[in-house]
Each structure stands twice: as structure tokens, then as C-alpha cells.
Design a protein with these regions (language model features):
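Transmembrane beta-barrel architecture of outer-membrane proteins
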Residues: 31-33, 49-53, 93-98, 144-146, ...
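Transmembrane beta-strands of outer-membrane beta-barrel pores
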Residues: 34-40, 58, 62, 72-80, ...
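Signature for the C-terminal beta-barrel architecture of outer-membrane proteins
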Residues: 24-28, 63, 67, 107, ...
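Outer membrane beta-barrel
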Residues: 59-161, 166, 193, 355-357
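Surface-exposed strand-loop-strand hairpins of Gram-negative outer-membrane beta-barrel proteins
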Residues: 35-51
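Outer-membrane beta-barrel architecture
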Residues: 53-57, 99-102, 150-152, 190-192, ...
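C-terminal structural cap/anchor segments
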Residues: 278-334, 338
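Outer-membrane beta-barrel "beta-signal"
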Residues: 307, 368-382
Length: 382
């Protein structure tokens, strides 16, 4: 929160310029949702809650096509979980969700503040999920942002270059299990270029991880912080069917025998829309996650295959996601039915999964999608 104050000061510098401009455009929009779920466990568990995310944006465009805009939004939420009609947990609060200011033109943008940064070609099992935690099962695609300065430049041949600096982020993000040091900036970049039939990209990121408060200090040699470097490769092609691949190589210079220094993540996927009725969309991905002591060692692997499908039915849509773990021979099943009505969207979810979710690093051990159950959700967009 102390770093948020600095970004508030940054954005407040630009507010007088917005207010003094007659052609300034202001918008207030947002999203409100309520949900209730039942988990068929022993004993039976159920969950209910609500969320409100209002978003205020303000922007001004000059005759030179230079644009200055900002967005402020908060995530206010209330969640209760029960077992045998007795409360077993609750969570509520108001947290900053997005808080950024941006200067942009037709070919570049520079954005500073609390923002979402995500990229890559995969859709379900994403090795390049470095800064977000979007879950493909979540229809709202909510994810916390990161405090960052992000610059992007778009070339005439559709290539684009990214540079970023992150600072003040003391919680884990993406696939991380150890948070970054909030006092030491992280930095990286990405270059994406067009290739025959599609596009390809290379990404890099460097951070300093902080073990204090995460593991037993007796097993660590040195200060408890260590550098980590990431290299990412991805590509996507339209060859009649959609094909994509992602690869992430992570090296941690940690002086202890309790952690393996190399992490490798790989995804290969494809999708196609069949001309059946209103159009049946299907996609599949193969994913492998491994840790090793040396970069070319096979290490300890976790392997998953995923399949997703959706079919539109007028104002309704039926979809599903299926995962199979080749490591422990387990299935993850998720079916959703969606109905759209003006500003309202209604969802019905059915799930049948192992008692412990091992796919996504959400940081939440009490996952209501674990086991078997049903969930209802209503969403209002304004």
C-alpha cells in the first residue's frame, strides 16, 4: 500500500490538465456480480459472495493524435464459506484493482501504475503467465495487477517491442512460489515479429526474489535474496487450424540444496471451429512443467493435456474444459452454461475434480472448484 501512494501522487500530477481541458472525456463503468456454490464433500461445503468493481476513466486527445488517459478502479468483495451451516472462513475488503496513467499515440504507449501485463500465445496452460493469474475457467477473467512502468512501440510491419520495469510488488504472481523483493526493481522486455503464417516472439525478465518469511532461514546460505532470470519463446500460426507454442526457461541462483535452480515450462496447442450448426469451437493443449538441477536434465515433470469446447445457442452458450494429469492419472472436469440478457449475464458451473487442485498456482488452498459441485453466478455490467 505504501507504493500505491506514490502512484497516486504520479496520477494526481496529470489531473489538473484533464480538468482544465474542455474536450476531456470521462467515463464511469463497472461490473457487479454475486455467486453461490455447493461443494459435495463430507461434510458438504458451500460458498456465497459478491463483488463490485467500479472503474473511472478520463482521457484527452490532442490534434497531433497524442492521447493522455488514466484509469482508476477498485475491487470490493465479500466472501463467506460454510460447512454444515457453520462458518469456516470469510474474506472481505476493498483493494486497488487498476490505477494507471498512460501517454500514447498511434505507434507507442507509455503506461505507469497498477496495471495488467500479460502476453503469449497459449490460452489455458500458459508458460508465459509471468505477471497475471488469469484462470480460463473464470468467465470474468479477473486478475490482480502489478505496479509497473510499461512501454510499447508498434512498427509498420506489425512487429512490436515491449520494455517494462516493475517495482513495489511483494506478492507472488504468475507461476511464482517465492515473492520478489519489493525494494529492488524488476525489469524485462519482449520483441514480437511477424513470420509466415503468423507471429513469433522472445521475452526476457529479471527479478530478485526474497525468501524472508517464505521458507526456513536455516536452510538458506547468504542474505535470503537471489537473482532469477526468465527467457520466453512463443509463436502462433494460422494454417487452416490454429497452432501455437510457448516455452519458458527460468534460472534461480539460490544457494541451497533444497531448491532446484532450473524450471522449464512448455505448451503446444491447436484450435479449430467446426462448421456444425452455429459453429463448434474446440482447442487442445499439451503442457509440461519440470524442475531440474541442470538445464538439460529431464528433472521432475508434471504433464497435463487440456481440451476446451464451446457452442453458441442463440443468446446462450454451452462450454466445457477437460484436463488430464499424466503424472497422477487424474481428471479435471468443468462445464459452464451462459445466458446473456441485456446488461446481465448468468452462469451455471458444474465441476468434478480431484480434492486438491494442482494445475493453477492461485495461492488459494481453499479452492471451491476442488472436488465435486455446482456454482451459480449473476453478473451485471454498467
Amino acid at each position: 500500500m505504501k507504493y500505491l501512494k506514490r502512484y497516486i501522487i504520479l496520477i494526481s500530477i496529470f489531473i489538473p490538465g484533464f480538468l482544465n481541458a474542455q474536450d476531456t472525456i470521462c467515463k464511469l463503468k463497472g461490473q457487479m456480480d454475486g455467486y453461490a456454490g455447493l461443494n459435495i464433500a463430507n461434510p458438504i461445503k458451500w460458498q456465497t459472495g459478491a463483488r463490485l468493481i467500479p472503474s473511472f476513466s478520463i482521457g484527452k486527445t490532442w490534434k497531433t493524435n497524442l492521447k493522455l488517459d488514466a484509469e482508476i478502479s477498485v475491487n470490493s468483495f465479500l466472501d463467506y464459506q460454510f460447512s454444515d451451516w457453520k462458518s469456516i472462513g470469510s474474506d472481505y475488503g476493498i483493494r486497488p484493482y487498476r490505477f494507471w496513467v498512460r501517454l500514447s499515440s498511434e505507434r507507442f504507449e507509455l503506461r505507469a501504475g497498477l496495471q495488467k501485463i500479460n502476453f503469449g500465445s497459449a490460452s489455458m496452460l500458459r508458460p508465459l503467465m509471468w505477471f497475471d493469474r488469469m484462470d480460463p475457467r473464470d468467465p470474468l477473467q479477473l486478475t490482480d495487477g502489478v505496479y509497473a512502468l510499461l512501454g510499447r512501440y508498434y512498427f509498420q510491419n506489425n512487429a512490436n517491442a515491449w520494455l517494462w520495469i516493475l517495482w513495489g510488488n511483494d506478492k507472488t504472481k504468475g507461476w511464482e512460489t517465492i515473492p520478489s523483493s519489493s525494494r529492488i526493481p524488476e525489469f524485462g522486455g519482449r520483441m514480437q515479429i511477424p513470420v509466415p503464417g503468423g507471429e513469433a516472439a522472445i521475452s526476457f525478465h529479471h527479478r530478485t526474489a526474497d525468501l524472508s518469511g517464505s521458507v526456513n532461514p536455516l536452510i538458506i546460505n547468504g542474505s535470503g535474496t537471489y537473482p532469477e532470470d526468465r527467457l520466453g519463446l512463443d509463436g502462433k500460426w494460422d494454417l487452416g487450424v490454429g497452432l501455437w507454442t510457448e516455452y519458458s526457461l527460468i534460472h534461480s541462483e539460490l544457494d541451497t540444496a533444497y531448491f532446484q535452480p532450473w524450471t522449464k515450462l512448455f505448451t503446444l496447442g491447436m484450435d479449430y471451429t467446426f462448421g456444425l450448426g452455429n459453429g463448434l469451437y474446440m482447442a487442445t493443449e499439451f503442457f509440461r512443467y519440470s524442475n531440474a538441477n541442470k538445464v538439460f536434465d529431464p528433472g521432475v515433470n508434471k504433464t497435463f493435456t487440456s481440451l476446451t469446447a464451446n457452442y453458441p445457442l442463440g443468446i446462450n452458450k454451452l462450454g466445457g474444459i477437460l484436463y488430464y494429469s499424466w503424472t497422477d492419472k487424474s481428471w479435471y472436469r468443468f462445464i459452464d452454461f451462459q445466458r446473456q440478457s441485456d446488461n446481465w449475464t448468468y452462469y451455471l458451473f458444474l465441476f468434478w475434480n480431484p480434492d486438491r487442485i494442482l494445475i493453477y498456482n492461485t495461492g488459494n488452498e481453499n479452492n471451491m472448484f476442488a472436488g465435486k459441485g455446482i456454482q451459480l453466478m449473476a453478473v451485471y455490467n454498467f
